[in-house]
Each structure stands twice: as C-alpha cells, then as structure tokens.
From Swiss-Prot:
Cellular compartments annotated: Cytoplasm
CC annotations in GO: cytoplasm; membrane
Keyword Cytoplasm: yes
Catalysed reaction, written as an equation: a (3R)-hydroxyacyl-[ACP] + UDP-N-acetyl-alpha-D-glucosamine = a UDP-3-O-[(3R)-3-hydroxyacyl]-N-acetyl-alpha-D-glucosamine + holo-[ACP]
Keywords: Acyltransferase, Cytoplasm, Lipid A biosynthesis, Lipid biosynthesis, Lipid metabolism, Repeat, Transferase
GO biological process, one term: lipid A biosynthetic process
Keyword Lipid metabolism: yes
EC assignment: 2.3.1.129
Pathway the protein contributes to: Glycolipid biosynthesis; lipid IV(A) biosynthesis; lipid IV(A) from (3R)-3-hydroxytetradecanoyl-[acyl-carrier-protein] and UDP-N-acetyl-alpha-D-glucosamine: step 1/6
Enzyme class, first EC level, given as a word: transferase
Name of this protein: Acyl-[acyl-carrier-protein]--UDP-N-acetylglucosamine O-acyltransferase
Protein family membership: Belongs to the transferase hexapeptide repeat family. LpxA subfamily.
Self-association and partners: Homotrimer.
Protein source organism: Blochmanniella pennsylvanica (strain BPEN)
C-alpha cells in the first residue's frame, strides 16, 4: 500500500506488499522489499536498499547507499523470520548497514528515536540502541550489543558482541570495547579503560549539582576504592537510597554479563 501523498522516483522499485505512509519521499534508484513499512514523512535520498521484515517510523532521514534489514552475518542464520525496528527522527547517513536479528537473540535489531548514525556505521544483528545516541563514522557494533540512551561513540570504534554501553557514556575514537561500560563514564583506548565521568555531558543535559556529586561518589566507589564489583554494588545500593540516580549504576551492574571495564 502506497499512500497517495508519497513521492517516489520512477527509477525506484517498491515491491508489492510494502507499506509506504503519507508524505514519504523516496529518491532515485532505491529498492524497498515487500515486507517493509516506512512511516510518515520519512526521506530516502537515493540508492538505498531496505529489505526483510523492516519497520521504520516517522520523520527519519536515510542517506544514499544505506542498507537496512538485510540478512545478518551470523553463520547460524537459516532464513528464520527475524526483523529490524527503527523508531522516529533518526538520521541514518551514507553507507550505514543495519542487519536483521536472529532467533538466538530476540529476533529483532531495534533502534530507538532521535539517533545519528554517521557514515559507514555498522549495527549487527540483535543490537538494541536507545534514544539520542550518536555514532561517528565507521563505528562497528558486534551482534547483541546494547547501547543505552544519550551515548556518544567516537569514530572507528569497535564494540565486541554482547557488550552493554550505559546511558550518557562517551567513548573516544579508535577504541576497542570488549567489556561493559557503566553509565556516565568516559572511556578510551584499545582495550577501552575508564577516564573519569562525562561531567560536561551531564551538565548539558540538566543534571542537578547534587546528582552530579552523587555520581562522582559512585565513580569513586566503583573505580577508586579497593572494593570488588559485588561489594561496590552493595555500597552503591546504600548511596542510591539517598540519591535515586545511582540506581543507574546498580541496575547496570545487575545486567552486566561480560564484566565492566577497569
């Protein structure tokens, strides 16, 4: 179904069954598969391939040579019915690739809202990306990576499969991430190690002075004391009773399966 207000260049191929909502603009030489749905006011520049079971929300901008919903690169994949879901207001720049999920994951690769994926970013199968994230040129995510809200990842950075990147994290360029990065932290290097807190980012996003001080205290517990992760978790729970923002650390440590960067 193609809405009558959609604008589609005659050189583009829209397979029967695709759903194109109102005021979508599809430029030249695009291919849209039969199981694709594109939300209102989304713009496809040119030379874009969208395949598989792919749901794209409203007001996204997708640039030339992007490939969305293609078969993943997991050798176990056997043409199972898996998909990708993309939210609203995302900018997906040139040559970005986002692959469909696997049955070994949750059958879905999921992108939130208001993200910027710069040129040549690769998001592998079963990744879950939150909202308001920025991935600079040539960032590569392995399968099953989770990136929480308001995270910034510098160019040429590679993240190992199954890693979790916490909210408000900033990762410097050319880093190699092989373990989980707790919230609010600046990380850099190969292998990535912590370099303090993303204080400037927290201030820009309106965190109160008391919350920032509490986050500093949490960082000291986790990285400047001799505590094990388990004993640090208990100390953080006590701090969270007075400062609920510290529950971000506690919940993250509960989720972490690969261990945290040290």
């Amino acid at each position: 179904m193609i809405h009558q207000s959609a604008i589609i260049h005659p050189s583009s191929i829209i397979e029967e069954g695709a759903i194109i909502h109102d005021n979508v603009h599809i430029g030249p030489f695009c291919f849209i598969g039969a199981q694709v749905e594109i939300g209102a006011r989304t713009l496809l520049k040119s030379h874009i391939v969208i395949n598989g079971i792919t749901q794209i929300g409203e007001d996204n901008q997708i640039y030339q040579f992007a490939s969305l919903g293609e078969v993943n690169q997991d050798l176990k994949y056997a043409k199972e019915s898996t998909r990708i879901e993309i939210g609203h207001y995302n900018q997906i720049r040139e040559s970005v690739t986002i692959h469909r999920g696997t049955i070994q994951g949750k059958k879905v690769t999921k992108i939130g809202n208001s993200n910027l994926f710069m040129i040549n970013v690769h998001i592998a199968h079963d990744c879950i990306i939150g909202d308001h994230c920025v991935m600079a040129n040539n960032v590569t995510l392995g399968g099953h990576v989770r990136v929480d809200n308001h995270t910034i990842i510098g160019g040429m950075t590679a993240i190992h499969q199954f890693c979790i990147i916490g909210t408000h994290v900033m990762i410097g360029g050319c880093s190699g991430v092989v373990q989980d990065i707790p919230p609010f932290i600046i990380a850099q290097g190969n292998h990535a190690t912590p370099f303090g807190l993303n204080i400037e980012g927290l201030k820009r996003r309106g965190f109160s002075r008391s919350s920032v001080h509490a986050i500093r205290d949490a960082y000291k517990i986790l990285y400047r004391s001799s505590k094990t992760v388990e004993s640090a978790k208990e100390a953080l729970k006590a701090l969270a009773a007075e400062h609920p923002i510290i529950n971000e650390f506690v919940d993250f440590l509960i989720r972490s399966q690969r261990g945290i960067i040290r």
